[in-house]
Amino acid sequence: ETALRAKIENTLCLEYPADKLEILVASDGSTDATDDIVREFEPRGVRLFRQEGRVGKTETHNNAVARANGEIVLFSDATTEYEPDVLRKLLPAFADESVGCVAGRLIYVDKASSNVGKGARSYWNYETFIKSAESKACSLIGASGCLYAVRKAAYQPMYAEACSDFLVCTMLYRQGLRSVFEPSAVCFEDTNHRPSDEMRMRVRVISQTYTDLWRNIDMMNPLQSGFFAVELISHKVLRYAVPLLLFALLISNILLARESVVFSIILAAQVFFYLLALAGWVLERIGVRLKFLVIPLYFVLANLASVIA
């Protein structure tokens, strides 16, 4: 509830003409004070859309977009803080009629200085690099859910199980529209600092993405979707296949260890790396944070999430 108040105040401070800005807060059957908080801001132009029945984020998005009046719909999360100029940075890209979505740059803030938070920031810096390259080469295959804008006329309702900020780029590409990355449009969000919270979040997102990839498997055919297919395969499919490759590497290494000292050393290095990750997990739970455990912990956490999903 505190985050929601701060989010609405932050949105009201955006540098954009008030008469051209509609702020719509979607509440998915909230049972706390969410709706009452939003109503407090109604005199300042904030609208409440209450979705009955707890249908989930994606269905709520679908129904909220149908009630929005603008030509461009900007999606956000209640926990995200925008820079005041995000709209002025995002919107010019829509002057290109081939652009259907513009995604901004998310910067994670690790207030707790946790190893999980540091790992998430490192991972996201790499993810941001990939997004920038995809945008220049062809099109984004996924946006950051806390900061992306879409042409309302091109938005299509999605099934409830979808990871909406990922699937939207595929749906737009089917219509011949690109999704681009605008790094100067910036938002901030706190990282998770507990391994269990980060694991839960990653499992949820990855399981939804698996569903989206399966339902859009035709888009992974380069003959149909060109370089977009290459991006989907390299960015998502191969990434989620890493645990299988790591398992195969470990098993083959075990079988070959007796044949060569080199293989024995490599096996020992693998086991040591996984032990470091385990130590990082245990120590993080009791509040002990060692910097050299950041990479092993988050690498194993992210790949374990792919397996669980």
Language-model region placement:
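Acidic helix N-cap motif at the loop->helix transition within catalytic regions
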Residues: 2-6, 20, 31-40, 85
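A conserved acidic beta->alpha catalytic loop
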Residues: 13, 17, 27-36, 53, ...
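Long helical/loop segments within the catalytic core of UDP-sugar-dependent glycosyltransferases
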Residues: 42, 49-50, 58-60, 84-162, ...
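Short aromatic/hydrophobic "clamp" motif used to bind/position activated sugar donors
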Residues: 73
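Membrane-embedded multi-pass helical conduit in multi-pass membrane proteins
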Residues: 189, 239-309
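Catalytic donor/gating beta->alpha subdomain of glycosyltransferases that bind UDP-sugars
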Residues: 94-127, 160, 164-235, 304-308
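Acidic donor-binding/catalytic loop of UDP-sugar-dependent glycosyltransferases
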Residues: 2, 33, 76-93
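Hydrophobic targeting segments
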Residues: 4, 8-14, 21-26, 303
